[in-house]
Amino acid sequence: MNNLISKFNKIIYLNATKQTNKINCSFYSTTINNNNNNNNNNNNNNISNKKAEMSKENQQLLQDLEEEFDEDEFKPYVNPITKEIGGPKGPEPTRYNDWERNGRVSDF
């Protein structure tokens, strides 16, 4: 189960970093305690059934996320004209006398 959750968190983190947002996922588990033994057995059965349903839903969600996950989305940008990897996406900046990197512009 921990392996399943770590894969789920990895997929969520990769999709979140693609959009430059961070998503924090938390998983909680609860138990119900009753003093009545008859109700306790019924509640334990209900809880185990709910956990089984949730684990099936989690596995389905994980499969859906893995299908959407595409390795090509994380490849670095390659300029089709200059074949430069990870360079500027617009026209050549030195040709137009300015350079912009991470929101900072310098003119020369």
From Swiss-Prot:
Pfam family, one: DUF1674
GO biological process terms on file: mitochondrial respiratory chain complex II assembly
Keyword Mitochondrion set for record: yes
Record region (Disordered): 33-59, 79-108
Presence of the UniProt keyword Chaperone in the record: yes
Any one GO CC term of the record: mitochondrion
Compositionally biased intervals (Low complexity): 33-46
Record InterPro entries: SDHF4
Compositional bias (Basic and acidic residues): 95-108
Intracellular or extracellular location(s): Mitochondrion matrix
UniProt KW keywords: Chaperone, Mitochondrion
General function of this protein: Plays an essential role in the assembly of succinate dehydrogenase (SDH), an enzyme complex (also referred to as respiratory complex II) that is a component of both the tricarboxylic acid (TCA) cycle and the mitochondrial electron transport chain, and which couples the oxidation of succinate to fumarate with the reduction of ubiquinone (coenzyme Q) to ubiquinol. Binds to the flavoprotein subunit SdhA in its FAD-bound form, blocking the generation of excess reactive oxygen species (ROS) and facilitating its assembly with the iron-sulfur protein subunit SdhB into the SDH catalytic dimer.
Entry similarity comment: Belongs to the SDHAF4 family.
Subunit field text: Interacts with SdhA in its FAD-bound form.
Protein name: Succinate dehydrogenase assembly factor 4, mitochondrial
Species assigned in the record: Dictyostelium discoideum (Social amoeba)
